[in-house]
Amino acid sequence: MESSTATHSETTSAQGSNGAGREDISSRPGAQISYEDLYRRWEQGNWKAYDLDFSQDKVGWESLTDMQRKSGLWLYSMFFYGEDAVTDGLSPYIDAAPKEEQKYFLATQQVDEARHAVFFHRFFKEVIGAGDTLAEGLAFTEPLLDWGYRGVFGRLETMCDELRADRSLPKFAQAITLYHLIIEASMAQPGQHFIEDFFIKAGNMPAFSEGMRNVARDEQRHIGFGVKVLSELLEESEECRAAVVELLREMLPYLTSVFIPPDWDEEYTRCYGFTMEEIFAWGMKSVEMKWKAIGYPMQEMPAGVYPFDPAMPHEERASRQLKLLRAGILGPPNGPAKSSPEIQEIYFDVVAKSANTEAVDKPVTVQWKFSDADPWHVVIDNGSSRAVQGEAEKADLTLKASWADWIEIAMRGESPGKMVLRRRLRPRGSLRVLRRLPEIWEPREITGVVAE
């Protein structure tokens, strides 16, 4: 194995008796992470799911409010189901890893994920009283999983199948991105942060708190591995970089929709002392740090990968994202999309920032005229793009539709060609610009352009 970046004495002193308080390796630059150090941390941080005593936690669970228990079932179900799914899915990752050091670490991670699943199974069985067996416990969680969550984990299942058939470096880069950067860094780590924070302060479920601290420490190590692998792959291969971008574009609609509580009842988060805006903002900060550590900051990614202005404060970005979700622009189908001047401003700002300005060799204006909402247009000129409310003085291309129909095309995958035939989408103007739209906006991004 390569030499470690930390000495044994440094590692031991940083870890302490149980590893709590140790530096988060997942935030280090990839070049400062070694596979040897990651493996050593696994040996030193080992813990036993069956050493936890849940007797006091059962009393603590009963002391929670009805809303806190209801919310807890929703949150912990995502963790329990996810830990089982990733345990099942790691084998093809081990086979596809190009380096022996990577295979060894992934083998330790599979053990970790199984231990996490056992921890959550014990909690569900002994504290909540749900499921005598692992299978029964997992069946209990399934109705509580949301659309975005199912989309991400459904993609993990197909990714594992793809990795069995294709062990190329670009496919491996996609697989690591999905597992370590999307599932662990973007989904699990933010949830762990807020759950752990609440129960450490409350002190009424000590075994659960200790288990969550252990899980969080393991996940930091896993994410650190993902940062290390991707920093190597993306530095060596433009093909790997393109494959990662392709996956990020594919997963954006699902990822933005995870952690939406049932029926949009925000008491599911407020009852634990945090808002949805806070968890979304914290997640954004965390993920941006990981991509910066990889050496591929989100600001350098192509248009449309993350279509919110990275210069905007995280809290404002989180608020805007949630407004699009509540309006039915992002997220699962939930009736006709809502429209308001504010929603349109947010939406078209995203559309403008998603434009590939290099796809046109002269200024282009694309206009949307809605039968039931205000008109907007996007101007692409000299390597920049901007969204403007109102009709353009001179548009190269005008797209006429109702707001609801346009969102069906843009966000739900409705065929533009079929909508044209049904006269629910009426393009007017330059055929050249119309043909160029799939180059300006990648197919099935937030603009709804589909290459047909």
Regions found by a protein language model. Name each.
Residues E43-W47, K58-E62, W74, P333-K338, ...:
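A generic short-segment signal for beta-strand/edge and adjacent turn/coil regions
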Residues A14-S17, N356, D381, V388, ...:
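Intrinsically disordered, low-complexity segments enriched in small/polar residues
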Residues E2-P333, V379, P443, V449:
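Non-heme di-metal
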Residues V287-R317, Q367-E414:
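Low-complexity, glycine/alanine/valine/leucine- and proline-rich hydrophobic stretches
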Residues D309, L324-L330, A337, G390-E452:
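C-terminal interaction segments
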Residues A311-D381, R435-E452:
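Acidic, aliphatic-rich amphipathic alpha-helical segments
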